[in-house]
Amino acid sequence: MISGSDLRKGTTFELDGQVYTVIDFLHVKPGKGAAFVRTKLRNVIMGGVTDRTFNPTDKLQEAIIERKEMQYLYSDGELYYFMDQETFEQIPLNHEKVEDAIKFLKENMNAVIKFYKGEAFSVEAPNFVELLITECEPSVKGNTATTAMKTAVVETGATVMVPMFVEEGNTIRIDTRTGEYMERV
């Protein structure tokens, strides 16, 4: 059992016969009254998003999730194909199931696919990836009081904020959990 105060991004649980994963959460402690947890939930099976508020004392049934590392093969425009590296079985997934991870996945990269009762419902990119910058704004020198950042587009099409010294053609390491630049490789 999970208590309402244990809800975090990525937590998966059963509620009212449905399975939900937490997309976003906020612990609220008002000046008057009891604390509560405001969440944005995605229905794992149907794909819909809903807002729900929980008390910290609410008890929720944890869903049993299988995690399997698979290789991203290619996209045909509508579906994204992943291969089990043990059985060589290929599974197609639609954009709703890969939406956050696909920004950082290149062909032949490994990713973790989450399954609930044999049904794939989510893709997680590796925590850190190294990608080539294909487009980058020119560096403009100026009187900046803080670290100056500029926009860069990496080979997967994702947009990342990078420091001024990074140029087109550089390879950078990105934290896929936050989408932030980590370092130049």
Curated annotation (Swiss-Prot):
Pathway: Protein biosynthesis; polypeptide chain elongation. Keywords: Cytoplasm, Elongation factor, Protein biosynthesis. GO terms for cellular component: cytoplasm. Disulfide bonds: none annotated. GO terms for biological process: peptide biosynthetic process. The keyword Repeat does not apply. One of its GO terms (molecular function) is translation elongation factor activity. It comes from the Bacteria. Signal peptide: none annotated. The keyword Protein biosynthesis applies. InterPro entries: Elong-fact-P_C (IPR015365), NA-bd_OB-fold (IPR012340), Rib_uL2_dom2 (IPR014722), Transl_elong_fac_P/YeiP (IPR020599), Transl_elong_KOW-like (IPR013185), Transl_elong_P/YeiP_cen (IPR001059), Transl_elong_P/YeiP_CS (IPR013852), Transl_elongation_fac_P (IPR011768). It is found in: Cytoplasm. SMART domains: EFP (SM01185), Elong-fact-P_C (SM00841). Pfam families: EFP (PF01132), EFP_N (PF08207), Elong-fact-P_C (PF09285). Transmembrane segments: none annotated. Belongs to the elongation factor P family. Involved in peptide bond synthesis. Stimulates efficient translation and peptide-bond synthesis on native or reconstituted 70S ribosomes in vitro. Probably functions indirectly by altering the affinity of the ribosome for aminoacyl-tRNA, thus increasing their reactivity as acceptors for peptidyl transferase. HAMAP family: EF_P. NCBIfam families: efp, PRK00529.1. This is Elongation factor P. It comes from Clostridium perfringens (strain 13 / Type A).
